[in-house]
From Swiss-Prot:
Residues 207-405 form the Glutamine amidotransferase type-1 domain. Residues 1-203 are annotated as: CPSase. Gene3D superfamilies: 3.40.50.880, Carbamoyl-phosphate synthase small subunit, N-terminal domain. InterPro entries: Anth_synth/Amidotransfase, CarbamoylP_synth_ssu, CarbamoylP_synth_ssu_N, CarbP_synth_ssu_N_sf, Class_I_gatase-like, CPSase_GATase1, GATASE. L-glutamine binds at residues 61, 255, 257, 284, 287, 325, 327-328. The gene is carA. The lineage of its organism: Bacteria, Bacillati, Actinomycetota, Actinomycetes, Bifidobacteriales. This is Carbamoyl phosphate synthase small chain. It comes from the Bacteria. Keywords: Amino-acid biosynthesis, Arginine biosynthesis, ATP-binding, Glutamine amidotransferase, Ligase, Nucleotide-binding, Pyrimidine biosynthesis. It catalyses: hydrogencarbonate + L-glutamine + 2 ATP + H2O = carbamoyl phosphate + L-glutamate + 2 ADP + phosphate + 2 H(+). Its EC number is 6.3.5.5. Belongs to the CarA family. It comes from Bifidobacterium longum (strain NCC 2705). Small subunit of the glutamine-dependent carbamoyl phosphate synthetase (CPSase). CPSase catalyzes the formation of carbamoyl phosphate from the ammonia moiety of glutamine, carbonate, and phosphate donated by ATP, constituting the first step of 2 biosynthetic pathways, one leading to arginine and/or urea and the other to pyrimidine nucleotides. The small subunit (glutamine amidotransferase) binds and cleaves glutamine to supply the large subunit with the substrate ammonia.
Length: 407
């Protein structure tokens, strides 16, 4: 069910056994409960990956977001203990068209439906997700709520809640723009990933301080595979504490929320740049580098979320298929080197190194005069293609060259 042609709210037919999705603009969809029963609200977004739903659910960048899967059939391979990218599910809610009734995979340890229920994730299924996603592409992402079970009942009267009552709950949800969320998802204590693979048991080639703003588990492992000892540190870390780690380079991770609200992290990053440490940032880290250099950031209409986004490396002309999860982007000029705006070009020249071929959104920044670069997407490939794995090699090369120069 949804708005009628006049734009007013249609009266949906639903009962206590249904699940109801209410959008901020009044659209209503009635389906079946999926996962836990209850109420959840957040920003509704869509993800275009055909696979990798466990990695999606456990990506901290999805904090306070209701995720719609555009691929209709979800849950075939069940869930396992190997694929999660963090210690918990972070999505606020989950929407699929046709959940798989059967689990068929040799690694499966349970069903997705049961896992969502066990973790208290309220979901919804059996709605026209294609129609919903087309609406979000047209109107933009917005606040929404999923209601099922007792959440559909007015406790005072015992009657089903009206759409107006449900819509009021949705409109009381904070807007994503203006939210600071990285502290909410960051580790509270430092932990270390030692070199692995061919470097296991050997002295590290490089030491990296990785600031956790919502880091995915695979990311430090990609650096460890290249001989790095990675200290994953809380977002509350000070520059002095970073210096005490004696790192060869500093990394800023992905994460949720509005980069404009990350003032302390931007100031920390400027201290890192001032000290001459090699810097690599991804996703939220790219946005923070942009703001540290003096560029602005802005909210995208519906963002990039999925594992099939085409990105062009403007330095080589090569096109990469990449994994994305971002609703904000850096506002920087494309096609030329410019002076970084902060403090009259204090950080020298910078240029946009990567763009998204779907919409020309900035997907990477490269500093010319200081050892710093970043990308807006996820090179760790969890889930997703491995086209951008070379970026971790580039970071290692940057640390190697910086060490040779005695910095």
């Amino acid at each position: 069910m949804s708005q009628n042609e006049s734009g007013t709210i249609a009266i949906p037919m639903y009962d206590k056994d249904d699940a109801v999705l209410v959008l901020e603009d009044g659209q209503v969809y009635v389906g079946k409960p999926y996962g836990a029963l209850g109420e959840t609200t957040g920003e509704i977004v869509f993800a275009t990956g055909m696979t990798g739903y466990q990695e999606t659910l456990t990506d901290p960048s999805y904090d306070r977001q209701i995720v719609v899967q555009t691929f209709p059939h979800i849950g075939d391979t069940g869930v396992n203990s190997e694929d999660p990218e963090s210690s918990r599910i972070w999505v606020a809610g989950y929407i699929v068209r046709d959940p798989s009734p059967n689990v068929s995979n040799w690694r499966a340890e349970g069903s997705l439906d049961d896992d969502l229920a066990k973790n208290g994730i309220v979901g919804l299924s059996h709605i026209d997700t294609r129609k919903l996603v087309r609406h979000l592409r047209s109107a933009g992402v917005m606040r929404a709520g999923i209601f099922s079970g007792d959440a559909l009942t007015d406790q005072a009267t015992g009657a089903l809640k009206t759409i107006e009552q449900l819509l009021e709950d949705v409109k009381n949800t904070p807007q994503m723009q203006g939210l600071s969320l990285y502290d909410e998802v960051s580790t509270k204590e430092t932990y270390t990933i030692e070199p692995c693979g061919e470097y296991e048991g050997k002295e590290p080639l490089y030491t990296v301080a990785a600031v956790d703003l919502g880091i995915k588990g695979m990311t430090p492992h990609r650096m460890a595979e290249r001989g790095c000892r990675v200290h994953v540190v809380p977002s509350t870390i000070t520059f002095a504490e970073i210096e005490n780690l004696n790192p060869d380079g500093v990394f800023f991770s992905n994460g949720p929320g509005d980069p404009e609200q990350a003032g302390p992290e931007i100031e920390l990053l400027r201290q890192v740049l001032d000290a001459g440490y090699p810097f690599f940032g991804i996703c939220f880290g790219n946005q923070l580098l942009g703001r540290a250099l003096g560029f602005g950031t802005y909210k995208l209409k519906f963002g990039h979320r999925g594992i099939n986004q085409p990105v062009k490396d403007l330095t080589t002309g090569k096109v990469e298929v990449t994994a994305h999860n971002h609703g904000f982007a850096v506002d920087a000029p494309i096609g030329k080197q410019v002076d970084a705006p902060f403090e009259n070009g204090k950080y020298g020249k910078v240029f946009v190194s990567h763009i998204d071929l779907n919409d020309d959104v900035v997907e990477g920044l490269q500093c010319v005069d200081i050892p710093a670069f970043s990308v807006q997407y996820h090179p760790e490939a969890a889930a997703g293609p491995h086209d951008a794995a070379y970026l971790f090699d580039r970071f290692c090369e940057l640390m190697k060259n910086n060490s040779k120069e005695g910095k």
